[in-house]
């Protein structure tokens, strides 16, 4: 090894090939990158995926329709509520079931709280990845409060299994609404403080502004979705543009990157779009709690679900963008085909192109700004 190192140092060309992962704190899961460097400059960073592949889609074809719901939690364990809803919507469309209004409102409330919890992990770990540890703990502290609220609602803190085909599993527990509103009052102040201390910190801004810029047309061509797409200046949100559930009844803005401190589509824009989205999610939860209708929380669904032969697509706007389930029924009690379309996979695809010419340290910022979660890649 010593001879190899000396030989490389003596050469004018300092090219090296490194394995960045698969167990590295900055990869946010078991993901590996084959990194080619010339000194401190990246020539290429090629994603090497498959370390967390568990055949989730195939399992969806081996178990009954309701039996697959707990597995959807594992598609994105940081924001599991959205995978529940996407799959439920697809099966409901196969069954031609109308979900009760109260259940739709409860779905929106649970998903928006889950979005805040996921974004807190994203922005917190991003600050940590580029060198500041304490802000991450502030984000985790707020996320723990949300976990407590979701645990009171559905009994779980991470893999919720709350949404059901036809509705939701549980109604609001007594006093839960007031606890959520109390948290949101505190959380709005926390966001303002976080912006003052971190987001608008001169050192932090200089570290992320103009780094790993993804132009809007390139983001579209690569199929980026969610905050990664909107961070590049593309104004698209499934909740508004392809409305589902209770979302047509709520007023909210869709934050879009515009070069807040640098270039539209840079790492800071992707980061700050998520900060702004948390404030919008807070608005949606307040509106949903104020207008929550009375009624049933689940539709009448047959115990043995056998949809007519056909196909359906369930789309939701998850914390990582458009999450879609494509389900084909052959008339039996098991799906013929289940396909999940996630945002993290396309985000991984763009890394090789964008990473060329970056500094090695900027690869960490790029991965964090894309908010990649390993199980969404390996399905």
Curated annotation (Swiss-Prot):
Annotated keywords: Cell inner membrane, Cell membrane, Membrane, NAD, Quinone, Translocase, Transport, Ubiquinone
Listed EC numbers: 7.1.1.-
Chain coiled-coil ranges: none
Membrane topology reported for the UniProt record: Peripheral membrane protein
Top enzyme class: translocase
Keyword Cell membrane set for record: yes
Keyword Cell inner membrane on entry: yes
Molecular function, one GO term: quinone binding
Catalytic activity: a quinone + NADH + 5 H(+)(in) = a quinol + NAD(+) + 4 H(+)(out)
PANTHER family: NADH DEHYDROGENASE [UBIQUINONE] IRON-SULFUR PROTEIN 2, MITOCHONDRIAL (PTHR11993:SF10), NADH-UBIQUINONE OXIDOREDUCTASE 49 KDA SUBUNIT (PTHR11993)
Oligomeric form and interacting partners: NDH-1 is composed of 14 different subunits. Subunits NuoB, C, D, E, F, and G constitute the peripheral sector of the complex.
Function as written in the Swiss-Prot or TrEMBL entry: NDH-1 shuttles electrons from NADH, via FMN and iron-sulfur (Fe-S) centers, to quinones in the respiratory chain. The immediate electron acceptor for the enzyme in this species is believed to be ubiquinone. Couples the redox reaction to proton translocation (for every two electrons transferred, four hydrogen ions are translocated across the cytoplasmic membrane), and thus conserves the redox energy in a proton gradient.
Protein name, UniProt field: NADH-quinone oxidoreductase subunit D 2
Origin species: Anaeromyxobacter dehalogenans (strain 2CP-C)
Gene giving rise to this polypeptide: nuoD2
């Amino acid at each position: 090894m010593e001879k190899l190192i000396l030989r490389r140092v003596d050469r004018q060309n300092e090219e090296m090939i490194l394995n960045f992962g698969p167990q590295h704190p900055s990869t946010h899961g078991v993901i590996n990158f084959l990194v080619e460097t010339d000194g401190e400059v990246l020539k290429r960073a090629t994603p090497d995926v498959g370390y967390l592949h568990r055949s989730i889609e195939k399992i969806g074809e081996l178990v009954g329709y309701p039996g697959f719901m707990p597995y959807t939690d594992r598609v994105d364990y940081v924001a599991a509520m959205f995978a529940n809803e996407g799959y439920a919507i697809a099966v409901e469309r196969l069954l031609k079931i109308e979900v009760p209004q109260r259940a739709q409102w409860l779905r929106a409330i649970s998903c928006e709280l889950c979005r805040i919890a996921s974004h807190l992990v994203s922005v917190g770990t991003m600050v940590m990845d580029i060198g500041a540890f304490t802000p991450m703990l502030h984000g985790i502290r707020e996320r723990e409060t949300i976990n407590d609220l979701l645990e009171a609602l559905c009994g779980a803190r991470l893999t919720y299994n709350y949404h059901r085909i036809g509705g939701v599993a549980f109604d609001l527990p007594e006093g839960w609404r007031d606890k959520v509103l109390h948290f949101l009052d505190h959380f709005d102040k926390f966001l303002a403080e976080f912006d003052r201390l971190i987001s608008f910190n001169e050192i932090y801004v200089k570290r992320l502004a103009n780094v790993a810029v993804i132009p809007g047309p390139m983001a579209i061509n690569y199929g980026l979705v969610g905050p990664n797409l909107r961070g590049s200046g593309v104004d698209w949100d499934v909740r508004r543009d392809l409305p589902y559930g209770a979302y047509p009844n709520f007023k909210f803005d869709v934050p879009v990157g515009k070069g807040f401190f640098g270039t539209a589509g840079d790492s800071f824009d992707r980061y700050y779009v998520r900060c702004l989205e948390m404030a919008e999610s807070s608005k949606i939860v307040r509106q949903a709690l104020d207008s929550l209708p009375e009624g049933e929380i689940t539709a009448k669904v047959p115990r043995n679900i056998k949809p007519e032969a056909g196909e359906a697509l369930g789309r939701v706007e998850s914390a990582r963008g458009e999450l879609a389930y494509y389900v084909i029924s052959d008339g039996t009690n098991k799906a013929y085909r289940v396909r999940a379309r996630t945002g993290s996979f396309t985000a991984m695809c763009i890394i090789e192109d964008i990473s060329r010419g970056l500094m090695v340290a900027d690869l960490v910022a790029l991965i964090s700004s894309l908010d990649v979660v390993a199980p969404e890649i390996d399905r």
